[in-house]
C-alpha cells in the first residue's frame, strides 16, 4: 500500500500477476496503469514456422506469454519474436544491445508488419506501435514509457544482467515478455 496515493502499489513487472489475480477472483479492477490497447496486426511475410520455432512459441504461449527462447545463432529467433508480436496483438518494445541490431529489427518490423515503427537510441527518440530500443536507452526511458507496451522482447537477453539494465525490465509493465538468446552466458 502506498500512503502517498492511498492505493495498492507494486513493481511494474508484476502488473500481469495483479491483473490476472483480480480477473480470477472476480474482483473489479480499475486499471489505470496501462497506456496500451489491442493493436491489429497482419504478418506480411510469406513464411511458415519451422517445427522447433512453433514448439518454442507454443511453450511461450502456454507459459502465459512469458519466458525465454534459447536457440542457436541463425535459427530464427527473430521470426519467433515476429510470431509472438502477431499472437499478442499489442504494441511491442524490442530491446537490442547495439544500434546496428536496433536498425536491423526496425527495418524488419516495418517490412513484416507494415506499420510505423519507432526507435529509442542512437540519437533517435521516436515511439511507435512497435518500438525498437537499445538496452541503454530502455534503461533511461522505460520509467517514463514502460506503460505503453503490451509486449517486450529482449534480444540477446544475456545482456539484461549487466549492471543498470535489469532496472529497465523491472519498470516495464508489459504483461507479455519474451527473452531471446543463443546462450545465457554473458
Give the location of each predicted region.
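Interdomain "pre-motor" coupling segment immediately N-terminal to P-loop NTPase/helicase cores
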Residues: 1-38
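Conserved pre-motif I regulatory segment
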Residues: 34-70
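Walker A/P-loop
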Residues: 63-88, 93
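Hydrophobic positions in the central parallel beta-sheet of the AAA+
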Residues: 69, 94, 131-133, 152, ...
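Conserved helix-turn-beta segment of the N-terminal RecA-like "Helicase ATP-binding" lobe
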Residues: 95, 99-124
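Conserved motor-coupling elements within RecA-like helicase/translocase cores
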Residues: 121-131, 146-147
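SF2 helicase catalytic motif II
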Residues: 135-185
Amino acid at each position: 500500500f502506498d500512503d502517498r496515493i492511498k492505493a495498492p502499489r507494486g513493481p511494474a513487472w508484476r502488473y500481469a500477476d495483479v491483473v490476472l489475480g483480480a480477473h480470477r477472483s472476480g474482483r473489479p479492477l480499475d486499471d489505470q496503469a496501462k497506456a496500451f490497447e489491442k493493436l491489429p496486426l497482419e504478418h506480411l511475410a510469406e513464411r511458415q514456422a519451422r517445427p522447433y520455432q512453433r514448439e518454442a512459441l507454443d511453450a511461450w504461449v502456454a507459459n502465459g506469454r512469458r519466458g525465454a527462447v534459447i536457440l542457436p545463432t541463425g535459427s530464427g529467433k527473430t521470426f519467433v519474436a515476429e510470431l509472438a508480436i502477431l499472437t499478442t496483438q499489442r504494441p511491442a518494445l524490442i530491446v537490442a544491445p547495439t544500434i546496428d541490431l536496433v536498425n536491423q529489427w526496425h527495418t524488419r518490423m516495418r517490412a513484416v508488419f507494415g506499420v510505423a515503427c519507432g526507435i529509442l537510441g542512437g540519437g533517435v527518440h521516436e515511439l511507435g506501435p512497435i518500438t525498437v530500443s537499445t538496452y541503454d536507452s530502455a534503461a533511461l526511458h522505460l520509467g517514463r514509457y514502460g506503460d505503453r507496451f503490451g509486449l517486450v522482447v529482449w534480444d540477446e537477453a544475456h545482456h539484461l544482467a549487466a549492471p543498470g539494465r535489469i532496472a529497465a525490465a523491472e519498470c516495464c509493465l508489459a504483461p507479455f515478455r519474451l527473452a531471446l538468446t543463443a546462450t545465457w552466458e554473458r
